[in-house]
C-alpha cells in the first residue's frame, strides 16, 4: 500500500484518552528491542516516525498513529525487559489488558518476533493472551536478512511450533533492512481490517 499520510495522534494510558474514532485499529506488540519500531517505520515508509530507542522498555504508553485517514496503528509498549520494576510491569499489564479487552475498534494484532531465535516464554504468553481474547493475529518474523535464505523455513517452523500458531493466523517473513515482506504484511493487514489495498 502507498502510505501518503502517517501521523501520531495521541499517546494514551487510559481509555478516555483513546481517539474518538470508528476507524479500524491494528495493535502492534513485541518484546523490547525486537525491531517493532523498525517494522512500523519500514511499512509506513517513514525513517523516524517511531523513535528507535537504545533503551529497552522505553515506550510506556499506547501510541496511536493515523494511517492514510483509514486506520490506526497502535504501538504497544514492549514486554520482557528485565529491568522494569514490578509496579511498572503491573501497570503495563493493566493498560494492555484494558485496551485489548475493551476496544471495539481493534480488528487484529501484529506480533513481532525475531526469526533468528526461538520465541521466548514472553512471546508465547503474549500470543496466548491474544488468542484467549480471540484477536486475529499476524506474526511478523523479522530480521530475516540476518539468516541465510536456505534456513528460513527451518526457523519459521520453530516459530510456528513454539507459538502453536492457530489456523488463520499468518506468519510473514520480514526484513526492515531490505523491505522483504512489506507487501505481504500489508495484504494481511488489509484482510484483517477489511480495508482496501490502495
Curated annotation (Swiss-Prot):
Amino-acid positions noted as binding Mg(2+) in the UniProt annotation, renumbered to this chain: 37, 59
Gene3D superfamilies cross-referenced by the UniProt entry: P-loop containing nucleotide triphosphate hydrolases
GO MF term list: GTP binding; metal ion binding
GO cellular component, one term: cytosol
Domain EngB-type G: 22-195
Keyword presence, Methyltransferase: no
Keywords, ordered alphabetically: Cell cycle, Cell division, GTP-binding, Magnesium, Metal-binding, Nucleotide-binding, Septation
GO annotation terms (biological process): division septum assembly
Pfam family, one: MMR_HSR1
Co-factor requirement: Mg(2+)
Binding site for GTP: 30-37, 57-61, 75-78, 142-145, 174-176
Top-level division of the source organism's lineage: Bacteria
Record-stated family: Belongs to the TRAFAC class TrmE-Era-EngA-EngB-Septin-like GTPase superfamily. EngB GTPase family.
Role summary: Necessary for normal cell division and for the maintenance of normal septation.
HAMAP family: GTPase_EngB (MF_00321)
Protein name stated in the entry: Probable GTP-binding protein EngB
Organism the protein comes from: Bacillus cereus (strain G9842)
